[in-house]
């Protein structure tokens, strides 16, 4: 992904950066991995260990840090919806843009995200401007509630230059491509 913040040529094990499909039709089919964890995953999943290979995700923030498996560019594939059709098909909701804050537990199960801006959706139309919009939930339920993703015309690459992980803490650039998407029954908070 040429414009992604998590883009690199080779990871810190010398493995070329590559596309790894993680989820297909709601099921995990691949994982970010290193040379070591690829073999461990193959054994755990009952896959052919001889076929196991690193996904090229072993990175360190500096020469004086041990490489760890890190997020690279993780993207949601574009869907088939136009933005106008997505809004028109939504009776009641909030359209949120631009990530502002995040909090997620170590197991990546419980999360809360805040956004810069939001718009009320009523009767299939964008309405008044909202500030300090947040959404919170549990990861499996959240992703299972996605029922629409906009098309490639609306797909953009976003990212963060300060994704922290590890002990001692390592900061890395990570990217994610996405188009506007709709999630049902998500707990939200807004200031009007």
Map each language-model feature to its residues:
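N-terminal small-residue-enriched
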Residues: 1-192
């Amino acid at each position: 992904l040429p414009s992604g913040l998590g883009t690199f040529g080779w990871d810190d094990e010398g493995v070329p950066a590559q596309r790894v499909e993680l989820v297909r039709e709601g099921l995990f089919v691949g994982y970010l991995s290193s040379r070591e964890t690829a073999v461990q995953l193959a054994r755990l999943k009952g896959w052919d260990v001889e076929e196991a290979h690193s996904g090229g995700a072993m990175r360190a923030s500096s020469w004086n840090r041990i490489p760890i498996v890190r997020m690279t560019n993780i993207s949601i594939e574009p869907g088939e919806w136009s933005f106008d059709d997505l809004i028109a098909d939504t009776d009641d909701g909030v359209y949120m843009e631009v990530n502002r804050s995040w909090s997620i537990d170590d197991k990546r199960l419980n999360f809360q995200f805040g956004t810069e801006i939001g718009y009320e959706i009523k009767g299939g139309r964008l309405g008044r401007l909202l500030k300090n919009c947040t959404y919170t939930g549990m990861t499996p339920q959240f992703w299972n509630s996605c029922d629409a993703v906009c098309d490639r015309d609306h797909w953009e690459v976003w990212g963060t230059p300060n994704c922290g992980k590890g002990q001692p803490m390592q900061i890395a650039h990570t990217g994610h491509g996405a188009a506007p998407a709709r999630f049902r029954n998500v707990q939200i908070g807004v200031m009007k």
